[in-house]
Amino acid sequence: MLELRPKYPFKMLLEEAQKSRGSYLYQLRKAPSKCLDAVYSEQIAAISKIHSDSKERYGYRRVMYALHNQGMHLNHKTVHKLMHHLQLQGAHPRAYKKYNSYKGTVGKIAPNILNREFNPAKPMTSFATDITEFAIAEGKLYLSPIIDMCTNEIVAYDVARHTSFDQINRMLNRFENVLEENKVSVALVHSDQGWQYQHMHYCNWLKKHNLIQSMSRKATTHDNIMIEIFFGRMKVEMFYGKEKTFKDLNDLEKAIKDYINWYNSDRVCKKLKGLSPINFRKQALNSVSMT
C-alpha cells in the first residue's frame, strides 16, 4: 500500500486494503527508513533539491507547495515525515528589533484609511511601505521597500547606507515606473508615522500620482503588519545567524537584493495558493482580463 500513496487517494487505498486510518499510520510510523527511501525515492530527491534551492529556508509546508507545483501531490504530513527522515528543517520565525523613524508630528498625519484591510481583491490597488535596518560589524544598511498587499510582491525598493529622503525619492521613482507599466490610475499607499512619510514632498508625490495616503495609528505596529511580516521573514531567512558571513556592506547589499529577487520570483506562499508573488500576480491579472 505504501508504494501506491503518491499515486492514489489515501481514502481509496484504505478502503481497498480494508484498513483503518489509525492502523495504517501506526504501521507507517514503524516502517524502516530503507522502506521510505525505496518507496519515495523520487519525492525524496525532489524534496532535497527544493530545500537546497531555497538555501534551507523552506519548512515542510512550503516544500509541499513546491512539490505540488512539480506535479507531486503529497500531503503535509508525508512531507513532514520525509523531511524528518532526511533531517531537513526550515528557518524558524523569531522576533526582530523594529527600526523606528518616528520623530513626532513634523508634517502631515494621514488617517488610517487602510484600517487593517490587508487582503485586497486585485493586484496593484493597495500597497504598504516602511524602513528596516541590517547591522553588521562594518556598519548598517537600510532597506525601504513597497509591498503589494494582494500579491506580497516587493514592487519597488531602495537600499542605502544612511536614512534620508533621497532614499525615499529613489524608491518612489522606481515605484512610478511600476505604476506606469501597470496603468495604475488609483491606489492606496499605507505607512507608519515615520518622518519620511509626513514629509511634504512624499505627501505631494502621492497626491500627484492619484494615490491615497494612509497611516498607522501612533505606536500600533499591527496597522502595518504586512510589511512587518515581510521584514521578519526576510531577516530569519537570509540574515539572522549569518551576520558574520557577510564580508562587508557591499556583500550584504548583494544578499539583500538577491533575496528580494528570489522572494518575488520563486518563494511559494500558502496565501498565494502555493505560488510565488510574481506568478500569483500574473495569474490574477490574467483572470481579471478574461472577465
Regions picked out by a protein language model, each given a short descriptive name:
Residues L36-D37, F118-N119, I136, Q193, ...:
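Conserved, non-catalytic sequence blocks in retroelement Pol enzymes and Pol-derived host proteins
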Residues G22-K122, T220, S276-L285:
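Basic, flexible linker segments flanking DNA-binding modules
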Residues R116, P120-V155, R161-F165:
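An active-site-proximal beta-strand-loop segment
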Residues L13-L14, Y24, I47, V63, ...:
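Mobile genetic element proteins and their domesticated derivatives, centered on retroelements
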Residues A135, D158-N182:
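Active-site beta-loop-alpha junctions of metal-dependent nucleic acid enzymes
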